């Protein structure tokens, strides 16, 4: 039996679901943002300006997709909470340019932010928990999230607080079913474009197909740098009790079951890895993999929940 979150058929599409433009506090227009990412090999983006919903149907091409979205926020009991919402052009309940009620939401519990987005057909993704100094227990308590950002490139570039792997492992160890996302959160104030992204395996580059693949975990998250690509993960599966990773040339591949059950592989001097396997213990409940290259760029699979 084979288990995997990655679809068995389809092709890979690269994109990012968290970008700001001149519509809020970014420095590039939506048109210039689309042109930048498309010229650098991306297949899709979501423009998620603060507290305003963007659809941008007029910027869609046959080979480039604009995902509707927004980022809404609140200050609750002294904590700052940001939640990204993304959806399909027809299925979100928000028109292009819709502005959220800041009076109602500015001090809302973060659960209200999630509920606002999901009630209108959006996926909700908790943004940059490390930058927000979010209480991990509060994050774990939220219901209706699709995932959280394991890497936020802008936060990493400006504050060195963009890698939230501790939060993700905290949630995973407690049985959370959230997926992990890479995101740019680009504003243009620093070199904060094209460093956090996701690569989705989907049947085609259409809104429903792409977002459906994301919902079922058919993607991996990456931390790269502008002009460079993180390790590519071609497949991650469990076959007859063995976890198998296949990837582009890498320095390290970690297969992690739990804090006390893991299996790393490290390339010897002058060599590289493109595959790693680990026979899982019979009581393993889930497994994920992390792949890093010789420049320190990283990709994270989604966890496979074992049956």
Give a label for each model feature.
Residues 149-155, 172-175, 218:
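Short, well-ordered alpha-helical segments in soluble proteins
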Residues 112-113, 120, 129, 228-232, ...:
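Ligand-binding clefts/hinges and TM-proximal coupling segments of bilobed small-molecule sensing domains
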Residues 2-127, 134-136, 141-143, 149-167, ...:
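A metal-dependent hydrolase metal-coordination microenvironment
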Residues 1-12, 175, 179, 186-307:
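C-terminal functional module detector
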Residues 117, 171-172, 214:
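Hydrophobic, Leu/Ile/Phe/Ala-enriched alpha-helical segments that form helix-helix packing faces
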Residues 164-177:
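Short, hydrophobic/aliphatic alpha-helical segments
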